[in-house]
Amino acid sequence: MLNSFKLSLQYILPKLWLTRLAGWGASKRAGWLTKLVIDLFVKYYKVDMKEAQKPDTASYRTFNEFFVRPLRDEVRPIDTDPNVLVMPADGVISQLGKIEEDKILQAKGHNYSLEALLAGNYLMADLFRNGTFVTTYLSPRDYHRVHMPCNGILREMIYVPGDLFSVNHLTAQNVPNLFARNERVICLFDTEFGPMAQILVGATIVGSIETVWAGTITPPREGIIKRWTWPAGENDGSVALLKGQEMGRFKLGSTVINLFAPGKVDLVEQLESLSVTKIGQPLAVSTETFVTPDAEPAPLPAEEIEAEHDASPLIDDKKDQV
């Protein structure tokens, strides 16, 4: 009965306005009130502030600053084996496994379309048919920055407008095509393990989705698909990120979906649905053996990232996708 009521609210409540209100409130400096809200949040969700670079809640001017708080480097060591891809986020694995042609498992008895997840981009979908996927849910208590599973060269980013359903166990089991319906940012990378997609999925109360190379992607919420592309390799304007490096963040949190090409990686055997994830721990292993890591690409300076973002053309029409 209670679950039915909660599901009904998902369809009745004005999720967009609630999200805008939450984003507005979380960005405001309210002095003692901000600290009180943070303290209550920490207590209710049992947030481990000892891991944060700034463990004192009084040091955060806004709730958003607290929510995207950086962690101390030593609390998330990155596995250095060149054959290992690491977990991109703190959270819990919702589902994982093989992509069956165009079908991805959402919950027991519920699948959704790979092509729909990728906003109808069938060429991108072809890269991952019969490949591997991992869906990681970030709860409110988790660290909400997202990191790279491996070295990667950014090739494409697509913003897809959509619904703002909550993303949790209840909605995954009961809202059809949940991840293909919600707002999301799709990031496609070239890696030594083949193409990899890392998808940041929005939800109710997720105030914004950001990337390190382009800043805030949403809001504003304009209701149109947007697409950006970047050059390959070491060409001028390329964006290179290292294994374990931050690539994005949620202000209030949601879900990360990783897609890997067929035959390129095997997921770590002990991982299963509801496994706890920590950034830097093994997620998958290459099906090939790398004796030594390839030369690591140098991270792009911040000013060049900003310049590239300003120069990248926007394509606002769905039909212009490749």
Swiss-Prot record:
Which compartment or compartments is the protein found in?
Answer: Cell membrane
Q: Which cofactor does it need?
A: pyruvate
- The record's region (Disordered) falls at 293-322
The UniProt entry lists membrane topology as: Peripheral membrane protein
Active-site residues per Swiss-Prot or TrEMBL entry: D90, H147, S254
How is the cofactor bound here? Answer: Binds 1 pyruvoyl group covalently per subunit.
Among the GO molecular function terms of this UniProt record, one is: phosphatidylserine decarboxylase activity
| Record note on modification | Is synthesized initially as an inactive proenzyme. Formation of the active enzyme involves a self-maturation process in which the active site pyruvoyl group is generated from an internal serine residue via an autocatalytic post-translational modification. Two non-identical subunits are generated from the proenzyme in this reaction, and the pyruvate is formed at the N-terminus of the alpha chain, which is derived from the carboxyl end of the proenzyme.
Q: Name one Pfam family in it.
A: PS_Dcarbxylase
Kindly list the GO CC terms recorded for this protein: plasma membrane
Protein origin, superkingdom = Bacteria
Keywords (alphabetical) are: Cell membrane, Decarboxylase, Lipid biosynthesis, Lipid metabolism, Lyase, Membrane, Phospholipid biosynthesis, Phospholipid metabolism, Pyruvate, Zymogen
Compositional bias of type Basic and acidic residues: which residue ranges? 308-322
List the pathway annotation.
Answer: Phospholipid metabolism; phosphatidylethanolamine biosynthesis; phosphatidylethanolamine from CDP-diacylglycerol: step 2/2
What EC numbers are recorded for this enzyme? 4.1.1.65
Catalytic reactions of this protein: a 1,2-diacyl-sn-glycero-3-phospho-L-serine + H(+) = a 1,2-diacyl-sn-glycero-3-phosphoethanolamine + CO2
Query: What's this protein's function?
Result: Catalyzes the formation of phosphatidylethanolamine (PtdEtn) from phosphatidylserine (PtdSer).
So what family is this one in?
Belongs to the phosphatidylserine decarboxylase family. PSD-B subfamily. Prokaryotic type I sub-subfamily.
Extract the PANTHER family matched here.
Answer: PHOSPHATIDYLSERINE DECARBOXYLASE, PHOSPHATIDYLSERINE DECARBOXYLASE PROENZYME, MITOCHONDRIAL
Q: What NCBIfam families has UniProt attached to this entry?
A: PS_decarb
**Assembly and interactions?**
Heterodimer of a large membrane-associated beta subunit and a small pyruvoyl-containing alpha subunit.
Q: What protein name applies here? A: Phosphatidylserine decarboxylase proenzyme
Q: Provide the species name.
A: Escherichia coli O127:H6 (strain E2348/69 / EPEC)
